[in-house]
Amino acid sequence: MTAPSQVLKIRRPDDWHLHLRDGDMLKTVVPYTSEIYGRAIVMPNLAPPVTTVEAAVAYRQRILDAVPAGHDFTPLMTCYLTDSLDPNELERGFNEAVFTAAKLYPANATTNSSHGVTSIDAIMPVLERMEKIGMPLLVHGEVTHADIDIFDREARFIESVMEPLRQRLTALKVVFEHITTKDAADYVRDGNERLAATITPQHLMFNRNHMLVGGVRPHLYCLPILKRNIHQQALRELVTSGFNRVFLGTDSAPHARHRKESSCGCAGCFNAPTALGSYATVFEEMNALQHFEAFCSVNGPQFYGLPVNDTFIELVREEQQVAESIALTDDTLVPFLAGETVRWSVKQ
């Protein structure tokens, strides 16, 4: 006789860092998020980036048009910060509940970030306005100087950009997104109530050995890049400790297969279909399932000053195999953990 499956019921989660792209890709990937999550912070790094209220409103509508009937999902829009952004435009979007937050990409740090910020001084009037109105700043925390090793970019960002910024604007709410190092985990843990972080499933489950030993695995390649195991362990300990200023942010970032499996492949893991079960696996491995719901469904809304979702979902603990690929116009998408057997999945 087969033992009954273990079921884990939690308040509906939110994804506080998500890439949905646009066009056919958007239509393909939105349902994988909207069937599970109540809300998601949608990244603005389209081409061209989302820098105006009108662009955000139009993008939000394209997202909503792709949400299947029966899914109750709210996209939370963000503004892409540039050196030339008008603070008045940002404040208008925030006051009209179009922009939930603004995103700081250092120029050329990741996909479609060539329009990003060249220096903090260049956007200081914008940041001062954000501090004044209580608008959160979302930060891709890596320096991009050519002489700095890719594995050191996050730690160097803390000392050269993040800490001086927070010393200068002490009331600014900051989310240090997709942190990947012990340095960042310690920095956020030791910070005040105006500093929080998101962490992806891939940075909790894997380290750079998994990506590079025995062959290059392009579908584990993302930015910030996977680090050594001591950093992975620090992240696992932070999220499963019950610390309340770290929350779910998948950084799900879809690219067509041919753009990942190439001589110069794109960075990003399409983890929306498998992320929640992956997080549950980590919490179970760390004997910390009692903190799982807070990480997924409570800590984020608390930091943003939003209500928690009033519906619930269930995860079931039974082995399931992840699809090898997902159909996309003229190509396919390879999901995170493609072809692998996973322990936890969302109950349908």
Swiss-Prot record:
Keyword annotations: Hydrolase, Metal-binding, Pyrimidine biosynthesis, Zinc
GO MF, one example: dihydroorotase activity
UniProt-annotated catalytic positions: 251
Cofactor, free-text remark: Binds 2 Zn(2+) ions per subunit.
InterPro entries hit by this protein: Amidohydro-rel (IPR006680), DHOdimr (IPR004721), Dihydroorotase_CS (IPR002195), Metal_Hydrolase (IPR032466)
Assembly behavior: Homodimer.
Name of the protein in question: Dihydroorotase
Gene that produces this protein: pyrC
